[in-house]
UniProtKB/Swiss-Prot annotation:
The gene is rpl10e. This is Large ribosomal subunit protein uL16. Signal peptide: none annotated. The keyword Ribonucleoprotein applies. It comes from Saccharolobus islandicus (strain L.S.2.15 / Lassen #1). GO terms for molecular function: structural constituent of ribosome. One of its GO terms (biological process) is translation.
Length: 178
């Protein structure tokens, strides 16, 4: 069966389903790298993507956010060593689906609500508090607009509303005009 839309898994109720030692057949998360770029660089600004809603983000949405942010920053800044990107959320929660068929004769093949616990279909990261940080990008002053643009594009790949916050890592010097 095809993958359901992300809106089916955006909201949650109940505790997280994370005990992987008791769950057979969990697919691996699509997102594997959580840091990119140069972590030891000398940066001026930290740009953050912060959630303004509570919900779940599937692992394939996190991977889409990572790839589009990395691609945009690498293309606009010229190299992967001129920034540092860090994704802070990990998809621990296991998503289940009780597969239901909707075609002629499907009633002979499926069990309905009998044994309806569902099989694992993927994982998701839970956002349980407002204002949780999803992505941190550290850049120099000349690349600040590129980082904002990359996170704005990335926010469109997420099922939750977000905002962008810019934090200077050094005190801003005031230029004296004489």
């Amino acid at each position: 069966m095809p993958l359901r839309p992300g809106r089916c898994y955006r909201h949650f109720s109940g505790p997280a389903y994370t005990r992987k030692e008791y769950i057979p057949g969990i697919p691996q998360p699509k997102i594997t790298k959580f840091t990119s770029g140069n972590p030891n660089g000398d940066y001026d600004y930290e740009v953050r993507l912060i959630t303004t809603e509570i919900g779940q983000i599937r692992h394939n949405a996190l991977e889409a956010v990572r790839t589009i942010t990395l691609k945009t920053l690498t293309k606009r800044t010229g190299s992967e060593t001129s920034f540092f990107m860090w994704i802070l959320k990990y998809p621990h929660h296991v998503l289940r689906e009780n597969k239901m068929m909707a075609f002629a004769g499907a009633d002979r093949l499926q069990d309905g609500m009998r044994l309806s616990f569902g099989t694992p279909i993927g994982t998701a990261a839970r956002i349980e508090k407002l204002g949780e940080i999803l992505i941190v990008v550290k850049v120099k002053k000349e690349h600040l607009d590129f980082a904002k643009e990359a996170l704005k594009i990335a926010s469109k790949k997420l099922p939750l509303r977000t905002r962008i916050e810019i934090i200077p890592l050094r005190p801003i010097r005031q230029e004296v005009q004489s």
